[in-house]
């Protein structure tokens, strides 16, 4: 009984550590597609972006009910956005901005004029993202997750 309780507490601590560290890693990896975030992003901007990624991770956790699933979703979103942004920066030297959503048809029509071959840097960062997604397999599932309507009320 006591050993079971200790294992449960250990799993909760590991999940909490993952909920704190993985979103920060996702931010830095996403930024690594286009530049070195530690030297080119101001400290306060790094802090607020990491807080934003933490907030997204916790929201996903409350919606999904599983740490592993929430963090995997966040890693996939960060990877896709980072790759998309890297190609946009490569082609027009400006990052993705919200109003780019309105010009997606134009982007699709001229996409055949560009070379989408990834460079070594993109491949390495993508492999690191995929390794992070795979390593989350070792985070134990929660026993007895709360249904979504109960999570939203709490």
Regions found by a protein language model. Give the residues of each.
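Transmembrane and membrane-interface helices of multi-pass
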Residues: 2-154
């Amino acid at each position: 009984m006591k050993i079971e309780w200790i294992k449960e507490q250990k799993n909760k601590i590991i999940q909490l550590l993952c909920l704190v560290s993985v979103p920060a890693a996702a931010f830095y990896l996403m930024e690594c597609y286009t530049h070195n975030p530690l030297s080119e992003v101001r400290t306060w901007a790094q802090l607020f972006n990491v807080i934003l990624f933490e907030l997204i991770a916790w929201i996903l956790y409350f919606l999904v009910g599983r740490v592993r699933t929430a963090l995997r979703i966040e890693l996939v979103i960060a990877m896709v956005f980072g790759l998309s942004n890297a190609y946009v920066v490569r082609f027009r030297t400006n990052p993705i901005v919200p109003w780019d959503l309105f010009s997606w048809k134009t982007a699709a029509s001229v996409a055949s004029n560009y070379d989408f071959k990834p460079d070594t840097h993109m491949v390495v960062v993508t492999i690191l993202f995929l390794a992070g997604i795979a390593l989350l397999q070792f985070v134990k599932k929660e026993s007895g997750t709360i249904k979504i309507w109960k999570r939203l009320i709490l």
